[in-house]
A protein has these predicted regions:
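Solvent-exposed residues in well-ordered beta-strands and their adjoining turns
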Residues: 43, 64-66, 118-120
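Ampiphathic alpha-helical segments that act as solvent-exposed interaction surfaces
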Residues: 78-98, 121-154
Length: 169
């Protein structure tokens, strides 16, 4: 793809069609900083964002996850060494997925994390889009597995890590 003005709508329509064809398109979000911003569900009940920032030749795929209050409570009771090891493990493991990430940490306790990856104009295909969506999701899932491993698996549905409505909220 070549992100020129005349092709903006074609790129937007192609990406939307690919997402809809695979049953993951949820809605178009209002975003003044983007040519388009789609909210998707991949897999079911996991909210992610597909965004083309204005003036950029890139599509950004992202997923924000809020850590469950029960996990935060368990982390608060952990030793400083356990907290530091957990944060180190999260960072080193996310790096293995070759994604970008931002950890929101307060007093050595993970509160939220955002995982993103980019597809540039010369690599935008349906295949690249879905491989990137899957990689971002698997990186997010890996963080949940690390949380469960280090601080206990929360079995009831209300207390597992959950998504904000959008990574930009």
């Amino acid at each position: 793809y070549n992100f020129k003005q005349g092709e903006k709508m074609t790129i937007e329509q192609d990406v939307k069609n690919w997402l809809a064809d695979e049953g993951v398109f949820r809605e178009k979000a209002a975003d003044e900083n983007a040519d388009f911003h789609f909210v998707i569900e991949f897999p079911k009940d996991n909210v992610m964002d597909v965004v083309k920032p204005k003036e950029k030749d890139v599509i950004v795929i992202g997923c924000a996850t809020q850590v469950a209050p029960e996990h935060i409570s368990l982390m608060q009771n952990a030793s400083p060494q356990e907290k530091n090891k957990f944060l180190f493990d999260v960072s080193t493991n996310l790096n293995l997925f070759l994604v970008d990430y931002e950890l929101k940490v307060d007093q050595d306790i993970l509160q939220q994390y955002v995982v993103t990856d980019n597809i540039y104009e010369d690599g935008l295909t349906k295949d690249a889009l879905f491989k990137t969506i899957k990689r971002v999701f698997k990186a997010k899932l890996h963080c949940i597995m690390l949380l469960n491993y280090d601080f206990g698996n929360l079995n009831n549905n209300n207390s597992k890590p959950h998504n904000e409505n959008s990574m930009f909220v």
